[in-house]
Each structure stands twice: as structure tokens, then as C-alpha cells.
Amino acid sequence: MMKLMLFSIIVILFSLIGSIHGADVPGNYPLDSSDDTYLCAPLGENPSCIQICRKHGVKYGYCYAFQCWCEYFGR
């Protein structure tokens, strides 16, 4: 019985840890007027990507795989 209780506590703790970290933030690559993605460098937080994302109505974005990625952006 004690093993079952310990196992249950461990499962609950791991599920809480998973919910704290959560899933990846949804988003999308914004497209320009030619339906192309915006290219960028350097990778990571990038001022030009943040500016592009704001132009598309999103507060934050960054450079991922040399293309601007906007968090919480849906086409």
C-alpha cells in the first residue's frame, strides 16, 4: 500500500512539473506581400523580427531557422 501511495505522489509531481513548463508557445511565420517568409539573422531575439511581428499585430517574435517567428500569431 505504501508503494502505491509513493508511486501516486511521484506521478502527480511529474504531471505538475509538466503543466508548469507547458507546451511550446503557438505561433507562425509571418508572410510578406509576396507570400514569402521574412529572413533574419542572427538567430534568437532579433529586433527586426520583433518589429515585423508588431507590424502583423503580435507583441513578440524572434529569429528561428533564419526566418522570423511570431508567438501567438495565426494566419
Swiss-Prot record:
Keywords: Disulfide bond, Ion channel impairing toxin, Neurotoxin, Secreted, Signal, Toxin. Transmembrane segments: none annotated. It is found in: Secreted. GO terms for molecular function: ion channel inhibitor activity; sodium channel inhibitor activity; toxin activity. The keyword Protein transport does not apply. Residues 1-22 form the signal peptide. Residues 25-75 form the LCN-type CS-alpha/beta domain. SUPFAM superfamilies: Scorpion toxin-like. Pfam families: Toxin_3. GO terms for cellular component: extracellular region. PROSITE patterns: LCN_CSAB. Expressed by the venom gland. Disulfide bonds join 40-63, 49-68, 53-70. InterPro entries: LCN-type_CS_alpha_beta_dom (IPR044062), Scorpion_toxin-like_sf (IPR036574), Scorpion_toxinL/defensin (IPR002061). Has the structural arrangement of an alpha-helix connected to antiparallel beta-sheets by disulfide bonds (CS-alpha/beta). Probable neurotoxin that inhibits ion channels. Belongs to the long (3 C-C) scorpion toxin superfamily. This is Toxin-like peptide AaF1CA7. It comes from Androctonus australis.
